[in-house]
């Protein structure tokens, strides 16, 4: 039996991991920010020692992309705390699996093919830069980075739940159609992570991997599929990013190649539309 620590408890991925791990033989400890602040080096070290942690799944992160353009706390959490965590995990021979993002890319404005795991990062906002710098520390200390993209779940604040809400209150919506990535369900990502732990593959991994659902879409196409599944009468029209200016720039293209993770025979990617339908069914059940 392995002792697993999941940080960022209460977030959509940690909730999905808790669900996916319900019937496993391993011991999962899932802690919220209030219960374990990854910026508190001494508290993290005490947890690793006292619980004899074998694997840390770090879901804790500063994720407000807009606010990060002005709030430098993003670097304290996504870079400095992650560097400290990875150093401690190396010291105590604990496997670290750190969750990262497609937003470490974006600087290559002509890109139109999926990013490989070893492609150079080129973030275009503070959030992406902080995550890229955190990744560097994890890899330097022998840890595992799993990049994902456009994450959503049946819980919390995310694009799917927002669009479902808006389609019930607004007759029309405009959604950007010039940013392309892959919508990814926290449910499928969590099952993949728990599977790696159950099969003990995680103990023999290091470096950078990508995991998203299969396929790609723009935010507009994503919104249209949400509306279709929900039989919403709201009219959704496409617009450009210049029509919806934001403080933080977003990648025009950030599709991730899953080449490396798919070398594991047990990894089966779920089509993003299938995963979305499952999530929406769960939302409606709640």
Language model feature labels by segment:
Residues 2-21:
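N-terminal Rossmann NAD(P)H-binding glycine-rich loop of SDR-like oxidoreductase domains
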Residues 38-79:
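NAD(P)H-binding glycine-rich loop region in Rossmannoid oxidoreductase-like domains
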Residues 69-97:
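NAD(P)-cofactor binding segment of oxidoreductase domains
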Residues 76, 80-84, 104-105, 109-146, ...:
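Catalytic helix-loop patch of NAD(P)-dependent Rossmann-fold dehydrogenases
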Residues 136-181, 187-188, 194-195:
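NAD(P)-dependent short-chain dehydrogenase/reductase
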Residues 192, 199-245:
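Mid/C-terminal beta-alpha module of Rossmann-like enzyme folds, strongest
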Residues 208, 218-224, 239-279, 283-286:
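Conserved C-terminal active-site "lid" loop/helix of NAD(P)H-dependent oxidoreductases
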